[in-house]
Amino acid sequence: MKNNQPIIQFKNVSKQFDNDPLVLDHVSFTIEKGKFYTLLGPSGCGKTTILRLIAGFTEASSGDIIFEGKRINHIPANKRPINTVFQDYALFPHLNVYENVAFGLRIKKLKKSMIDEKVKEALSFVNLVGYENREIKDMSGGQRQRVAIARAIVNEPAVILLDEPLSALDLKLRYQMQYELRELQQRLGITFIFVTHDQEEALAMSDEIFVLNKGKIQQSGTPNDIYDEPINRFVADFIGESNITKATMIEDYLVEFAGKQFTCVDMGMNANEPVEVVIRPEDMEITSVEQGMISVTVHTQLFRGVHYEITCLDSEGNEWLVQSTKKAIVGEQIGLRFHPEDIHVMRFNESEADFDRRLDSYSEGETDGE
């Protein structure tokens, strides 16, 4: 059961190598017990550095790393109740499955009967009972990953760190392992911190996501919150497909873009404030020019299996991406429709704290109006 107690806290943590630019720039966040967290971002954003700082593989240049209320900056990795599953799994090729999983327990000098019991339990969690004597070289990529996870959980750590463990798997197996990892975390109740650059993985598995770019957390929240209410252009563009355009917030609940004014659900900004608007492609409905809110010309069309991916151009040269089960014809004029709640207004340079306060005020307004 999730108890909402903090287990890890970063307080203004920075990391710099030599005289290079900051890899992490005054990062602060809280990790709660029993949840599945994902650190999401492009290469070089700082996500793996955060993982290494938590594990104790590197030290912070400044700031405090807190574990269960105690500062652990200088506590070595082997003294932390944290285990890591690496991208290449880091299994011992000369040891079989049992010996790999039992390795950490043997270092602790536990009795053989206890080691046998714990290894069997760990292998049962990852559906590998009966594989104890299998050589690592004879196992598939998915099986090797399960061995690595069993080796991590057998020590009963408080936190498991996963450094892009699915990246080497083929697409079908990657999807399967997403389900298995999520189910395993929920059964164990252990805090998982997962690193990836794949936004689909993050959305599918996480209780909460931290989106990073250039050493800073851009936004944190549930998958739904981040997808539905991105804080800025980077997050909107990185999490899923997006239509992003410059706009003007005329007044509360009224925004102007593509040469027209549209009703929206956003408020609390300055009159005529320059903003950006994001509309997800799946929220754009194809209709006739007469019924459309925006008139566009179909530019390209690709069949993606579950939908058509259609790019369109409006009279001002803005490109609109539409995902629809309706087929369009390249060169034809069509109309696009969307609802006020499909329009998400983003302020320039808004802090996450201010952003959260603004969204909270929307909920308070709904409550007051009831």
Swiss-Prot record:
Instruction: Write the record's keywords in alphabetical order, separated by commas.
Output: ATP-binding, Cell membrane, Membrane, Nucleotide-binding, Translocase, Transport
The protein's superkingdom reads: Bacteria
Q: Which InterPro entries has this protein been placed in?
A: AAA+_ATPase (IPR003593), ABC_SmlMolc_Importer (IPR050093), ABC_transporter-like_ATP-bd (IPR003439), ABC_transporter-like_CS (IPR017871), Mo/tungstate-bd_C_term_dom (IPR008995), P-loop_NTPase (IPR027417), PotA-like (IPR005893), PotA_ATP-bd (IPR017879)
What are the GO MF terms of this UniProt record? Answer: ABC-type putrescine transporter activity; ATP binding; ATP hydrolysis activity
Residues making up the signal peptide according to the UniProt record: none
Q: Name one GO cellular component term.
A: ATP-binding cassette (ABC) transporter complex
Q: Which reaction does it catalyse?
A: ATP + H2O + polyamine-[polyamine-binding protein]Side 1 = ADP + phosphate + polyamineSide 2 + [polyamine-binding protein]Side 1
Indicate the segments forming the ABC transporter domain, all copies.
8-239
Q: Which Pfam families match?
A: ABC_tran (PF00005), TOBE_2 (PF08402)
Which residues are ATP-binding? 41-48
Identify its membrane topology class. Peripheral membrane protein
Q: Name the Enzyme Commission number(s) assigned to this protein.
A: 7.6.2.11
Function as written in the Swiss-Prot or TrEMBL entry:
Part of the ABC transporter complex PotABCD involved in spermidine/putrescine import. Responsible for energy coupling to the transport system.
What is said about its interaction partners and assembly? The complex is composed of two ATP-binding proteins (PotA), two transmembrane proteins (PotB and PotC) and a solute-binding protein (PotD).
Sequence similarity: Belongs to the ABC transporter superfamily. Spermidine/putrescine importer (TC 3.A.1.11.1) family.
| NCBIfam families (alphabetical) | potA
- Quote the protein name from its UniProt record: Spermidine/putrescine import ATP-binding protein PotA
| Classification of source organism | Bacteria, Bacillati, Bacillota, Bacilli, Bacillales
Gene symbol here is potA
